[in-house]
Amino acid sequence: VSVDCSEYPKPGCMMERLPLCGSDNKTYNDKCNFCNAVVESNGTLTLNHFGEC
């Protein structure tokens, strides 16, 4: 399971409300918020699964 974050980071996120569960067991509201967190973590954050944790 993966998400393409190549176009991130983005300065602002629209609220898509498509939850993603990260490897930190945190639920991200959408791909934008998740991908921005991946960039901030220098790629250490990964996707556990789609949906809430």
Swiss-Prot record:
Cross-referenced SUPFAM superfamilies: Kazal-type serine protease inhibitors
Domain Kazal-like: 3-53
Residues annotated as site: Reactive bond 3: M15, E16
Primary subcellular site in the record, as a coarse category: secreted
Signal peptide region: none
PROSITE patterns registered for this protein in UniProt: KAZAL_1, KAZAL_2
Glycosylated residues in this chain: N42
Protein's UniProt name: Ovomucoid
